[in-house]
Amino acid sequence: MTRFVVVVGTADTKLDELVWLKCCLLLAGVDSIIIDVSTSILGKNHQNKKSLQVAEYHPAGADPVFCGVWNKAITVMSVALTTFLNSSIDDIAGVIGIGGSGGTEMITPAMQSLPIGLPKIMVSTMASGNTSAYVRASDIAMLYTVTDLNGLNRISRSVLSNAANMMAGSVNYFTPLANIHKPTLGLTMFCVTTPGINQTNIKDYLAVVQIITCELSLIVEPKLIINKAWQQAERIF
């Protein structure tokens, strides 16, 4: 089976935008399916997976999704979408979502659950602000809509076309992660700690008896790190 891009959004409010994205992907030579995550059932027929079908992936079934309480419904649908995407992960080449505040809050947690390297683009009205809650420790690319997503216009067509072409490029020139079975060490850095975290002295860090966290290392004099004075640094703790 050919892998496809998942185009996800609420078809009850953004069907035109979803269909536009699908058409743009088709023009770029990429197969895609539309996944509806509406929390109301309006019986539209243009999407490949209707909201009821996605909602049934929730552990408690579809009923909690269509509870009529907006903030609860998007939280529950997000859980269902997460399960749905992960159950189909072998067939998915990428995920592109569109949404306002509610749609972004619903779609991005599901994206976060997907493997690093799988292309993920969120076209959102929220992308011009603090996006940390939407991205977290994932590789989601956020693209600002400029306008509200409430029907197609010359600006939204341009933004959505760019998003589709970004996804097409990511899919057509996809580079898989190297399959290296080695232990992985994660280090972080902040300002004055940067000189201590690089490839040239990483082995020295592994030799330190005590772990110096990012927060605690802020009280270590930079010269101790630069001069690799690990014993002196350890005495601070």
Residue ranges of model-derived segments:
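Phosphate/nucleotide-donor binding subsite
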Residues: 45-90
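Generic secondary-structure signature for well-ordered alpha-helical cores
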Residues: 13-16, 23-31, 83-90, 112, ...
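N-terminal phosphate-binding or glycine-rich loops at protein starts, especially the Walker A/P-loop
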Residues: 2-42, 94, 104-120, 124
